[in-house]
């Protein structure tokens, strides 16, 4: 998918830039950032991030600045309308998900409920 198409999940410039830097450190240009949702955390669901060099059937791939964000169909249904960003601050540096579908989130923001 390209930057010109309305996407169900936004991949910010800051996140794409950080992914590009991390991938260059790994010397594997096939790596993509995978965002996923699993059961757990104090609010019921939690976000996860990993680098993956494959795209599975049904996965959505969002490309920006020469790197890709990959989301499986199950996770995507909970993330529609959200964004994946990267931030650096007093709490450290991390990828964050802004999710308009989350009814409540825990204090650290890493888990949520629908």
UniProtKB/Swiss-Prot annotation:
The keyword Kinase does not apply. GO terms for molecular function: 2 iron, 2 sulfur cluster binding; 4 iron, 4 sulfur cluster binding; iron ion binding. It comes from the Bacteria. Binds 1 iron-sulfur cluster per subunit. Iron-sulfur cluster binds at residues 42, 106, 108. InterPro entries: FeS_biogenesis, FeS_cluster_insertion, FeS_cluster_insertion_CS, FeS_cluster_insertion_RrpA, HesB-like_dom_sf. Keywords: Iron, Iron-sulfur, Metal-binding. Homodimer. Required for insertion of 4Fe-4S clusters for at least IspG. Belongs to the HesB/IscA family. This is Iron-sulfur cluster insertion protein ErpA. It comes from Erwinia tasmaniensis (strain DSM 17950 / CFBP 7177 / CIP 109463 / NCPPB 4357 / Et1/99). The gene is erpA.
């Amino acid at each position: 998918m390209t930057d010109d198409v309305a996407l169900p999940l936004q991949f910010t410039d800051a996140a794409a830039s950080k992914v590009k830097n991390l991938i260059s450190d790994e010397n594997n240009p096939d790596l993509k950032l995978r965002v996923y949702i699993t059961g757990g955390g104090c609010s019921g669901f939690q976000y996860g991030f990993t680098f993956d060099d494959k795209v599975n059937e049904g996965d959505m791939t969002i490309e920006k600045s020469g790197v890709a964000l990959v989301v499986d169909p199950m996770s995507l249904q909970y993330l529609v309308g959200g964004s994946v960003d990267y931030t650096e601050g007093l709490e450290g540096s991390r990828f964050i998900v802004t999710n308009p579908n989350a009814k409540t989130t825990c204090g650290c923001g890493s888990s949520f409920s629908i």
